[in-house]
């Protein structure tokens, strides 16, 4: 990420998902945004952090940011927040469920 970028600086000043979508010219899928808003924004931030923007023009940075938002939204079109496990609480819950699982092969039959 390139913090000196006017595009990225402007993104940090926006306060709502709707403002971010409008700034990047992305039409939100309303039902997805309404049910997964925080998850989309967190995933968008993760995609931005992992994107190398070194040497890109301002237009290139804008396009990469836009692509990151489109990708983040798309993740929740075909999936759910629970399946995507964006937040630690979901990861922890999945680990607990896995630990509670007892496979049939571990059970022993005791004859009396």
Swiss-Prot record:
InterPro entries: NifW. Disulfide bonds: none annotated. HAMAP family: NifW. May protect the nitrogenase Fe-Mo protein from oxidative damage. Belongs to the NifW family. The gene is nifW. NCBIfam families: PRK00810.1. GO terms for biological process: nitrogen fixation. This is Nitrogenase-stabilizing/protective protein NifW. The keyword Amino-acid biosynthesis does not apply. Keywords: Nitrogen fixation.
């Amino acid at each position: 990420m390139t913090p000196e970028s006017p595009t990225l600086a402007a993104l940090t000043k926006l306060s709502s998902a709707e403002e971010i979508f409008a700034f990047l010219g992305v039409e939100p899928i309303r039902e997805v945004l309404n049910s997964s808003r925080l998850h989309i924004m967190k995933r968008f931030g993760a995609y931005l952090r992992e994107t190398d923007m070194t040497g890109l023009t301002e237009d290139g940075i804008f396009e990469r940011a836009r692509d990151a938002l489109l990708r983040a939204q798309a993740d929740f079109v075909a999936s759910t927040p629970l399946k995507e496990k964006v937040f630690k609480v979901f990861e922890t819950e999945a680990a607990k469920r896995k630990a509670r699982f007892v496979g049939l092969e571990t059970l022993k039959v005791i004859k009396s």
